[in-house]
Amino acid sequence: LTNYEPVIGIMGKTGVGKSSLCNALFAGDISPVSDVAACTREPLRFRLQVGDRYITLMDLPGVGESGARDTEYAALYREQLPRLDLVLWLIKADDRALTVDEHFYHQVIGEVYRHKVLFVISQSDKAEPTSGGGQLSTAQKQNISRKICLLHELFQPVHPVCAVSVRLQWGLKVMAERMIKCLPREATSPVVSQLHPSFRTTVVREQARSDFGETVGAVLDSISAFPLIPAPVRAVIQAVRTTVVSVARAVWDFFF
């Protein structure tokens, strides 16, 4: 359980800010992603290490930039989606060309994998009316809220849409908390250990602690359900389950 290596896909069109968002969220350094067209035929992978913990980030090409490529990308996504714990789907605040994105989401992601997608509005500081200042204006925040409503209407996502600005360091803490809640239970603790310290909030840590305990409990349930387990042993496992889960939560800090 403590050695699980999560795989997170980062999806978005060229210039959406995938690398800058990852560098802002995670404590380790991440190599810049090449925008050379040939490099997008296979997803680029980056292994991020902090201490003895690892996560893999997979750069996934955005759709809608090349009609000839979108069919190829559909096959790529269908191959990779089962291996991913989460997909961060980045959409620029000023991107209005979403018809292809909508079609791709409903036809390729579909009902099977939509729970793995977290939509993120990136570069929120570029929302109209742009000012280039040190904080978002009231008008920009209103337009971002409208964009969030639009994405909910178009995609009907499982998880709430996030909005961030790496340049202004705006929205990142909320996004980190939502990202942790979207991950499968076995992935939350390893990802939390990789987050920049400022995003390891109480909410984030307690979510990971709870998930770790529940994951331990699920392992015990699997063992007790094994057909060859003698009934007395099964009874003991079931009797101590609550205690073991509580202990796992208590020692979470030691492991992560």
Where are these regions (language model features)?
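N-terminal low-complexity/disordered regulatory or targeting extensions
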Residues: L1-G9, K13, V33, N143, ...
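Conserved G1/Walker A P-loop phosphate-binding module
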Residues: L1-L60, V247, F254-F255
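Switch II of P-loop NTPase G domains
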Residues: T40-P43, L60-V87, I91-G110
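Short glycine-/polar-rich loops that comprise or flank the Walker A/P-loop
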Residues: R53, P82-V87, Y113-V117, Q156-P160
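Catalytic P-loop NTPase motifs of RecA-like helicase/translocase cores
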Residues: G64-E65, R96-A97, A127-E128, L195, ...
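Canonical P-loop GTPase G-domain recognition
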Residues: D125-S193
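Membrane-inserting effector segments that mediate pore formation, membrane fusion
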Residues: R209-F256
